[in-house]
From Swiss-Prot:
Disulfide bonds: none annotated. It catalyses: fluoride(in) = fluoride(out). It is found in: Cell membrane. It holds the Pfam family CRCB. It comes from Frankia casuarinae (strain DSM 45818 / CECT 9043 / HFP020203 / CcI3). It is a multi-pass membrane protein. The keyword Transmembrane applies. This is Fluoride-specific ion channel FluC 1. The chain crosses the membrane at residues 43-63, 68-88, 100-120. GO terms for molecular function: fluoride channel activity; metal ion binding. Na(+) binds at G78, S81. InterPro entries: FluC (IPR003691). Na(+) is not transported, but it plays an essential structural role and its presence is essential for fluoride channel function.
Length: 129
């Protein structure tokens, strides 16, 4: 039954990724992929919250349930974030001669996503731990 929850989460996450990416990117007049950066960091924060809540045994019990992890963690966050687009956009930056932006995208994305996941987990522990 959890596979249905993963599908439901992904059905929400994929269009949310597209809409967020377009909304963010159209507000920036740059080749830097701010839309992809935003969805990846947001998904990392949300996944940190979900994993932190599950690890802390958050009450009510549904918050830390396997179903919520499947729906939000695997489904929504999995579809919201996009490693393949991040990789392709970084490659495109490098091939177009924007090597500094490509390097900034790699370093910034990894650091920001890791920081967001850690922040999400810390917030969950502060609330439910």
């Amino acid at each position: 039954m959890n596979w249905l929850l993963v599908i439901a989460g992904a059905a929400a996450g994929a269009p949310l990724r597209y809409l967020t990416d377009r909304a963010v990117q159209t507000r920036h007049d740059t080749v830097f992929p701010w839309g992809t950066f935003t969805v990846n960091v947001t998904a990392s924060l949300l996944l940190g919250l979900v994993a932190g809540a599950a690890g802390a045994g958050a009450p009510p019990a549904w918050v830390a349930s396997e179903q919520v992890v499947s729906l939000v963690g695997t489904g929504l966050c999995g579809a919201l974030s996009t490693y393949s687009t991040f990789s392709y956009e970084t490659l495109r930056l490098a091939e177009d001669g924007a090597r500094l932006l490509a390097a900034a995208n790699v370093a910034g994305s990894v650091l920001a996503a890791f920081g967001a996941a850690a922040l999400g987990a810390a917030l969950a522990r502060a609330v439910w731990g």
